[in-house]
Amino acid sequence: QTQTSYSVVYLPSEISITPKPLRMEMFRSTGAPSELTKHTDSWFDWGIVDSLMCLSFFQYLNFSRPGNEKHKEVAMYNMIHVIKTGLRYFHRDTAFNLLGYSFMHENQLTNAYSCFNQSLKIRPYHNAAKFYLGLLFNRIHATNRGHTHYGNSSDISS
């Protein structure tokens, strides 16, 4: 018998062991859920990612340290491949956010912007891409002015 996991879920009680980018997914919405949507919106406080994207992102995190450039490139390719060929995945917005976060870490800011923008097209509301875009615009602004930027993503492994 073969079993497959479609999604990896991080609950708010697991925030201390949740990778930083998935923590952002836990805070994708603000305010209290309405009485009408309270039961269907309970997942808004969870970090949910499709299992294959999660594996590819963990590969990237593992190989993002110096000296692993080739493996890091393979992990980035794997994330792109998951998005392009993903037939059975349900959290495309999160996949684009994780890829965008990785591009931001690699200082490929145009690619990062494209990923976050794509994520917002999929899920315009309750999307962590809004936070990421704030960090991205801050980095671009600070870089253009020659200042240190906030939201440094150089330590993405903790």
Residue ranges and their predicted role:
Residues 1-158:
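Nucleo/cytoplasmic regulatory scaffolds in medium-to-very-large eukaryotic proteins
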